[in-house]
Amino acid sequence: MKVAVLGAAGGIGQALALLLKNQLPSGSELSLYDIAPVTPGVAVDLSHIPTAVKIKGFSGEDATPALEGADVVLISAGVARKPGMDRSDLFNVNAGIVKNLVQQIAKTCPKACVGIITNPVNTTVAIAAEVLKKAGVYDKNKLFGVTTLDIIRSNTFVAELKGKLPTEVEVLVIGGHSGVTILPLLSQIPGVSFTEQEAAELTKRIQNAGTEVVEAKAGGGSATLSMGQAAARFGLSLVRALQGEKGVVECAYVEGDGQYARFFSQPLLLGKNGVEERKSIGTLSAFEQHSLDAMLDTLKKDIQLGEDFINK
């Protein structure tokens, strides 16, 4: 199993690479790529960790050597948020980066499962889909927007609020991956209940958690370490499913049946070919249903922005 990390010299990429070097199954290959010249050195640094995961690093304009034979590609390349920016301010720079890298994936490893971490995910996933479609290699079961950070944040915040162990809590988060499009299904957590005010406040905290980190880092970065952990969790789940493990479920932002929007984050049963089944989001509370209805315009506009970037 070969996993490639694109953007591997950045804050998320290095954290993700460290976790994958430690946790990928024995015999896996890990391939690191970034435009930054430090990247082969990051791979050498990680190669000293005693795990049976082979690692190589590549830098420069051409990602091809890193992508050859990849089964899973995780893209974290791009610029990070600074205070006062929202995820859509990133669009102008990151759209071009994602387009370029996905064009290289389409040529070199078109059958790979691709996880997009680069923000704004609501839009960059649509860009990736359109690029793959133009190249004639798009498979909607193999393209994912990685929204796992919203889930691990939800698990942490719910556990704190309700005095549970974070490992005992698993929150489904649906919709998209920014602001109001992030919708944790708090009403579906077994053995936990919330007042309406608690649900509203907690939902807002989860939606704004990225900004909490950006402000706390005072201009020195955004959520890199927790995002690295979230991306590793998603990537490792995908690898386990591709290797034939049954019953692997993760939420991610994928093209579905278009019931809510063309792309939508929902629970997915993963399998040997990527998405095996898009699972139901279940029964929503009145607050959740209202929040879902209210976000769809925003989500659809985000998606349209990505489609137009490639097709206009």
UniProtKB/Swiss-Prot annotation:
Q: Name one GO molecular function term.
A: L-malate dehydrogenase (NAD+) activity
- Organism superkingdom: Bacteria
Q: Which UniProt keywords apply?
A: NAD, Oxidoreductase, Tricarboxylic acid cycle
Detail which positions bind NAD(+): 7-13, 34, 94, 117-119, 227
Reactions catalysed, semicolon-separated, are: (S)-malate + NAD(+) = oxaloacetate + NADH + H(+)
Residues that, per the record, bind substrate: 81, 87, 119, 153
Q: Does the keyword Chaperone apply?
A: no
Which residues of this protein are catalytic?
Answer: 177
The record's annotation in InterPro entries points to: L-lactate/malate_DH, Lactate/malate_DH_C, Lactate/malate_DH_N, Lactate_DH/Glyco_Ohase_4_C, Malate_DH_AS, Malate_DH_type1, Malate_DH_type1_bac, NAD(P)-bd_dom_sf
Output the Pfam families linked to this UniProt entry: Ldh_1_C (PF02866), Ldh_1_N (PF00056)
* Record's protein name: Malate dehydrogenase
- Native organism is Salmonella choleraesuis (strain SC-B67)
Which classification does the entry list for the species? Bacteria, Pseudomonadati, Pseudomonadota, Gammaproteobacteria, Enterobacterales
The gene designation is: mdh
